[in-house]
């Protein structure tokens, strides 16, 4: 085994870099959809601290309630998040929060929303904020993923911390039951899964797992996600015919470079910069320096507000 292979890079990834701004191999994620999902992700970041949403409340009604009770300006959030909150109410006005899970043991927060106007069911994971979240982030050992539809040999191994947070206290089962119940009522709806940081990793893992339970199209749009699993995970993920992943990253975001040792990214990568974006499809040949801590070293580029500003600026 070569040195770069040991670090987690394939032979292709250790060769030359091939450029970008080409069409994605699979259908491109709609920019408006990506922006809507990021706005909902930003809303979830503030849910426990500032916001109260009853299940089946529309997003429009929720925002109207904030405005009548002192306005968005009364919230202890910055202007970027206030803007995102207002925009998501305008763009997904009849969206409903169908389920909200907040697990005290793992500090996981995840919501399930339904948009009849856009015919989609969204599962939205909150990103890393608490000490507990970072504890799961830094559990870098792998665990074999055991579920129907996966080969046992060779095993598919994923980040033990992410898997533990998703499956503790039946969170995963509750989410699957909720989504499958909504599919029974809306069989033609697309399933969208999203999150930022830890939420991005959880959305990637959840999207893969639920794609084995449903026939509907599952689209994962992750933001600032770390790597989730090994090479067998990557292969199993990218052959699923009903599963699509658009991995949105800031150019120098350090979190997207970890874990490094024998972990691999999955899906199409949309890389954001201040004045442009680049697209790396599934079969793109990347330089071995790409997405390592030698090139992705900035903690500030991990900020969800910067993702929002760049995604708003870079249209496709």
Model region roles, listed by residue range:
Residues 200:
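Catalytic nucleophile loop
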Residues 2-32, 53, 109, 117-120, ...:
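Serine hydrolase/lipase
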Residues 2-114:
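N-terminal low-complexity, Ser/Thr- and acidic-residue-enriched intrinsically disordered segments
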Residues 126, 137-144:
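Surface-exposed loop and adjacent secondary-structure segments within mature catalytic domains
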Residues 121-125:
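Short beta-strand element of the alpha/beta-hydrolase
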